[in-house]
């Protein structure tokens, strides 16, 4: 796979100087706009931007001396000129789309730079899968920078994955052209305890002069937190409250605050800026996980910036947190993040800084979107058959695979139950007394059964437990091969027969999400690439995802973006309780605990 590197500043310097001094005509001139300067936090009226070879030559009050007969003139007509938006931490796979289709979906929303960690595909296809994502990313008309995944598996010994990423893999990847750093270091106990593999990955990244991504998903801000920071991670997006954001920034980390499809962590943390008055340079906006429905219906980073403003943030500060702060964090402030000479010409025209309508999007000096419509091609990688055949179940499953037996003679049991928390990634460790019928524990009330079906090595293994918070009613089951981060198959349901039907259906189609109610399939989203992504257009995938969300509501679920909650129930690095293919995990202690506590 080859790609054409974007011309560097040194390669274009002579032309940039010639245009800036009026000795050469610009390729493009944006005329008469309000220049939003994120370096000085100013809005300067009546400025022109001259562009040559995809880079900004000058930003001046009058650039008519830079024009020629072939100059593409864009009249801003007093609109604001803001830098293209940057997503500081995200997973493309969460959109259920390939990099090409993800780019096509977000370009009209003004996202021109993404810092993506493809650790989802790393767990399924290993280093080869990461390279496929990296290569398709480099083919796009916007900037998709890749962070080499650090933790596959996310927690060694607590789960098994399709592949493992090694320290040697990380060292090798640092030489790839699109790699800007190390993906989120999720094994935070490993870092705090100086695990040699984790430190080797961090060292390889630091020696390459690149950024180490963080993931500290614990409320403990004591010695474990201090040890984690001392290990080298430079940012963190797992904070959920003001104290988390302040603690990270005080220790020299960037606090990344996220608004994803189901993670609403901006409002609770941005008060560190808006109320406590801390310097906003060390705070960055990001999405982490957005599914296709959110991208198509609500937006991407424009949605996050608007939300920050609605939470009381000054619009110029919010824009800094989605542009120059992000670029600076990754050492790319001389490439992206501002409308200043030499930088890539990634520019948005908008008529309002608060509501942020994205009217024109320019990326690398090319108009890529107008009024919500993508105007450019987003080339596709030729995904091989091996990437499309990743669901290996080993056998056809039946209802007996989805039962939990009670201790002999028990009429009821006390069960450890995963408690879903709306709009947040952490869960609660709950206990419920559940009845026993004919020797089998029954899920009652708001408690449903959850199972993890092994799908990488065809073992036929099924691990069962209980979950609460979805509000499902009647006989139903939902299955998904998107099961962060091991990406086996999660099945949640109230009926063993429907759970078996749902699991087997995903085996037939090669991965995705499916929901059965009373034995009937209500919705299906096919995700044939690694069981995680579709290479169909975002609108098509979003329509199927919307149908899935409606099917969940029809089964009694009222959670906001419940699918995202569903997909994270196996992520054994975010407290408190999670399920893995090896058992029920208490992430507070990183130990397995029994599903059934004791007979009563």
Curated annotation (Swiss-Prot):
Cofactor(s) this protein cannot do without: Mn(2+)
Catalytic activity line of the entry: adenine + H2O + H(+) = hypoxanthine + NH4(+)
An annotated GO BP: adenine catabolic process
MF terms in GO: adenine deaminase activity
Entry-linked Pfam families: Adenine_deam_C (PF13382), Amidohydro_1 (PF01979)
Gene3D superfamilies given in the database record: Metal-dependent hydrolases, Urease, subunit C, domain 1
E.C. code: 3.5.4.2
Keywords: Hydrolase, Manganese
Protein name: Adenine deaminase
Gene name of the record: ade
């Amino acid at each position: 796979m080859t790609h054409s590197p974007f011309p560097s500043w040194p390669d274009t310097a002579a032309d940039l100087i010639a245009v800036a001094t009026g000795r050469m005509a610009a390729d493009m001139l944006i005329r008469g706009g309000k220049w939003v300067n994120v370096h000085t936090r100013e809005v300067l009226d009546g400025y022109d931007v001259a562009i040559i070879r995809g880079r900004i030559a000058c930003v001046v009050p009058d650039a008519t001396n830079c024009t020629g007969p072939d100059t593409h003139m864009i009249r801003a007509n007093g609109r604001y000129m803001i830098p293209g938006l940057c997503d500081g931490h995200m997973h493309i796979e969460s959109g259920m789309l390939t990099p090409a289709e993800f780019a096509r979906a977000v370009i009209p929303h003004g996202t021109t730079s993404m810092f993506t960690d493809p650790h989802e595909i790393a767990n399924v296809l290993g280093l080869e899968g990461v390279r496929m994502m990296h290569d398709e990313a480099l083919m796009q008309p916007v900037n998709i920078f890749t962070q080499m995944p650090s933790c596959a598996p996310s927690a060694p010994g607590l789960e098994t994955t399709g592949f493992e990423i090694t320290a040697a893999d990380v060292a090798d990847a640092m030489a790839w052209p699109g790699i800007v750093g190390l993906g989120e270091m999720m094994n935070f106990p490993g870092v705090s305890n100086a695990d040699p593999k984790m430190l080797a990955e961090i060292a390889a990244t630091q020696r390459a002069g690149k950024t180490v991504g963080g993931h500290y998903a614990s409320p403990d801000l004591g010695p474990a937190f201090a040890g984690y920071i001392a290990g080298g991670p430079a940012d963190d997006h797992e904070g959920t409250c003001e104290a988390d954001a302040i603690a990270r920034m005080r220790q020299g980390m960037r606090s990344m605050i996220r608004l994803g499809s189901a993670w609403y962590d901006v409002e609770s943390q941005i008060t560190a800026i808006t109320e406590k008055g801390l310097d906003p340079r060390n705070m960055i906006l990001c999405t982490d996980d957005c599914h296709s429905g959110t991208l198509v219906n609500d937006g991407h980073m424009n949605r996050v910036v608007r939300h920050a403003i609605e939470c009381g943030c000054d619009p110029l500060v919010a824009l800094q947190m989605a542009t120059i702060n992000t670029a600076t964090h990754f050492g790319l402030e001389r490439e992206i993040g501002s409308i200043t000479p030499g930088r890539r010409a990634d520019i948005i025209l908008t008529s309002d800084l608060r509501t942020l309508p994205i009217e024109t999007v320019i990326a690398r000096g090319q108009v890529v979107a107008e009024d919500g419509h993508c105007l450019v091609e987003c080339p596709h990688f030729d995904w091989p058959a091996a990437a499309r055949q990743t669901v290996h179940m080993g056998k056809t499953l039946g209802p007996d695979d989805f039962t939990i037996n009670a201790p002999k003679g028990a009429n009821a049991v006390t069960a450890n139950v995963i408690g879903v928390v709306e709009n947040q990634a952490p869960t609660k460790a709950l206990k419920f007394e559940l009845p026993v019928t004919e020797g089998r524990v029954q899920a009652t009330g708001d408690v449903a059964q959850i199972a993890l079906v092994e799908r990488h090595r065809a073992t036929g293994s099924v691990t069962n437990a209980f979950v609460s918070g979805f509000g499902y009613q009647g006989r139903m089951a939902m299955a998904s091969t998107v099961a962060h981060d091991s990406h086996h198959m999660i099945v949640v349901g109230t009926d063993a027969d429907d759970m078996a039907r749902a699991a087997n259906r995903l085996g037939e189609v090669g991965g995705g999400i499916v929901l059965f109610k009373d034995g009937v399939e209500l919705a299906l989203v096919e995700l044939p690439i690694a069981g995680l992504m579709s290479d169909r257009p975002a609108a098509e995938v979003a329509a199927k995802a919307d149908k899935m969300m409606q099917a969940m509501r029809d089964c009694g679920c009222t959670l906001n973006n419940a699918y995202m909650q569903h997909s994270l129930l196996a992520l054994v690095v975010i407290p408190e309780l999670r399920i893995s293919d090896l058992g029920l995990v208490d992430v507070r202690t990183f130990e397995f605990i029994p599903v059934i506590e004791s007979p009563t």
